[in-house]
């Protein structure tokens, strides 16, 4: 029977982290003598509450040091439209790593190699370092997955399994980030198995995984809980339960369970700790607040919430709420449009996604004053670039550092080989 520890954070975080490992024989037994460790955080962006808590990361690194880890590495590949070096520089994550003498591995700056996603016949790129360290059965290093406890507008929840999407190269992430997303997440879980997954539930994030800073208090709640175990699917099953969801409501977890990549039945998991205080169902959908003068036309045949629809709406929302972005344009997303409606379109238009671009561009290209395209299912960098122009928002103001420092950091990232797709 899989075991999952649920620890209330009532004392020092370092002690709470140790308490998560305790039911598995303690940190020393889980490490099994390994002196090198890689910690995969969730650091998609530098906006408030979008990343693993620096306090939790600090506690994790201190505990690993205490139990003999000598070569300590923290790794991430942030979301598109940004670059990982920026996220660590603009948040306390970078300072925590330096204080604990942990090396930061910016995965977008690493050389890549191709692997096939099992069962999908799709070849995608991962950092060669990740493939060499964790792509086989035998490993010398300890792999700790530390996601943030979040609901997610495109995947219902984002926990350990979803956190591993950050291992994939950004250029491949934007493709098939549609109805295929859940199958891709389950396939990645088959390739890369963390030795231990520890969910940071100090604060839960909901109404999507990317809350606008101006309304972040409406999108977070302090829970003061850590959840951990060796079986990532079992840990995610318990994490989903804390957020109010069953595995059946989370397609990628249901797929992983069906394919046998862990225990995904709550009744078959030995939960060490108390779940009774978690009684809410935290909404995963976005807040219903968008500029009234932006017209969104969805195709009648298909419009994937996992791709062109909710990625675009999330950017639209935070530019509107946080940066007072202007409207006065149309967004087309999905496929299966009314041809006459397309012919009647005027003014500026954003074609969001591959389907809308392929279907609508030939029809509207001679009628609309300005056309922007985001030509993959989740071409977030192009979406940000287009929407900042349409909404008259300076993209250099999207990060909490000066424009000069932003450009210096970007130059450093490019110098080190960054493949990140930046939205400027």
Predicted feature residues:
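N-terminal and secondary-structure boundary signal
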Residues: 1-424
């Amino acid at each position: 029977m899989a075991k999952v520890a649920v620890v209330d954070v009532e004392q020092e975080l370092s002690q709470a982290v140790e308490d998560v490992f305790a039911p598995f024989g303690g940190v020393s037994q889980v490490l099994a003598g390994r002196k090198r460790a890689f910690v995969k955080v969730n650091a998609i962006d530098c906006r408030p509450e979008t990343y693993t808590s620096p306090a939790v990361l600090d506690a994790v690194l201190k505990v690993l040091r205490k139990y003999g880890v000598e070569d300590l590495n923290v790794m991430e590949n942030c979301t598109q439209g940004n670059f990982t070096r920026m996220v660590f520089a603009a948040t306390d994550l970078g300072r925590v790593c330096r204080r604990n003498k942990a090396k930061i591995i910016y995965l977008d700056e690493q050389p890549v190699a191709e692997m096939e996603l099992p069962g999908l016949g799709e070849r995608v790129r991962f950092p060669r370092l990740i493939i060499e360290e964790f792509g086989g059965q035998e490993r010398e290093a300890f792999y700790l997955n530390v996601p943030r406890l979040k609901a997610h507008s495109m995947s219902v929840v984002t926990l350990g399994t979803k956190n591993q999407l950050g291992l994939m190269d950004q250029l491949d992430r934007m493709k098939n980030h549609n109805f295929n997303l859940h199958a891709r997440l389950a396939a990645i879980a088959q390739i890369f198995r963390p030795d231990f997954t520890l969910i940071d539930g100090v604060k839960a994030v909901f109404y999507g995984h990317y809350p606008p800073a101006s309304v972040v208090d409406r999108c977070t709640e302090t829970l003061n809980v850590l959840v951990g175990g060796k079986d990532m699917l079992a840990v995610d099953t318990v994490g989903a339960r804390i957020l109010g969801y069953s595995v059946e409501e989370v397609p990628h977890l249901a797929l992983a369970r069906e394919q046998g990549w862990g225990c995904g039945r709550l009744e078959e998991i030995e939960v060490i700790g108390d779940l009774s205080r978690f009684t809410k169902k935290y909404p995963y959908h976005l807040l219903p607040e968008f500029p009234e003068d932006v017209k969104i036309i969805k195709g009648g045949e298909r419009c994937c919430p996992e791709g062109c629809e909710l990625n675009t709406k999330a950017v639209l929302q935070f530019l509107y709420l946080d940066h007072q972005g202007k409207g006065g344009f149309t967004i087309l997303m999905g496929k299966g449009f009314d041809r006459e409606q397309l012919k009647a379109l005027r003014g500026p238009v954003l074609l969001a996604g591959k389907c809308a671009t392929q279907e609508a561009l030939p029809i509207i290209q001679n009628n609309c004053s300005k056309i922007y395209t985001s030509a993959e299912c989740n071409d977030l960098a192009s979406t940000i670039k287009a929407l900042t122009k349409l909404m008259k928002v300076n993209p250099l103001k999207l990060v909490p550092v000066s424009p000069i420092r932003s450009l210096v950091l970007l130059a450093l990232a490019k110098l080190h080989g960054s493949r990140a797709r930046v939205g400027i």
